Design a protein with these regions (language model features):
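Residues forming the flavin
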Residues: 1-211
Length: 211
């Protein structure tokens, strides 16, 4: 395995097992092929979370969340508490993709509307987001909504590019752990799965029954 660290630079290590615990990444606006320009004010929910929590920056004043993933629901509440107005959460599916408890605690408790079976059609604005067009997928009625920021919370993808680039597949020698294996609903589940894999590998390599 070739890797890099700050103290030693490029290093090479021999290993009998490789565990890929690279987590997952957010789906982006580009993956949805949403028409429109690329103005300022378009973020993934995770990026908005980093902006607010770490840098103290707000993505906008009037915000629309596209998708009902848990990070998006949590950020809808957080941005409301920070003083922004979350105008709506749009979800193209007939059901919520996040946890029900997050809908109750993050949307219902703060009177943030959730529009199921509604599709984002276009993001408007050249320099800065000025609004969006969306529609009801059943009635096909198009609506314009003025806003200055759009957050995407449309799912997570296991991060496996390292395996793909090396033309490798998971095996007994190459394991996937946590969200790199599949996206878990709770981080505790990913942690427990990773601990189990670590114990299994230790038993295989050390031949021990209790590790």
């Amino acid at each position: 395995v070739t890797f890099i660290n700050r103290s030693d630079g490029v290093c090479v290590a021999r290993a009998q097992r490789l565990v890929l615990a690279t987590g997952c990444r957010e789906r982006t606006r580009e993956m949805l092929t949403v028409p429109g320009f690329r103005p300022a004010g378009i973020f993934t929910a995770g990026l908005a979370q980093e902006m607010v929590n770490i840098y103290g920056l707000m993505p906008g004043k009037k915000i629309v969340v596209v998708g009902s993933g848990d990070i998006g629901l949590i950020m809808a509440r957080r941005l409301t508490l920070e003083g922004s107005q979350v105008l709506a959460v749009l979800e193209i599916q007939p059901q919520l993709s996040g946890l029900i408890r997050n809908k109750v605690q993050c949307l219902d408790d703060f009177n943030i509307p959730l529009y199921l079976e509604h599709e984002l059609l276009e993001i408007l604005g050249k320099n800065r987001v000025e609004g969006i067009r969306y529609r009801d997928v059943k009635g096909q009625k198009e609506v314009y909504m003025k806003c200055d920021a759009v957050l995407f919370s449309v799912g997570l993808i296991p991060e496996r590019d390292l395996l793909i680039d090396q033309e490798m597949t998971p095996s007994n020698e190459v394991r996937l752990a946590g969200n790199a294996n599949y996206v878990h609903e709770l981080v505790d589940h990913a942690t427990k799965e990773s601990e189990k894999i670590g114990q299994e590998i230790a038993q295989e390599l050390l031949g021990a029954k209790n590790v």
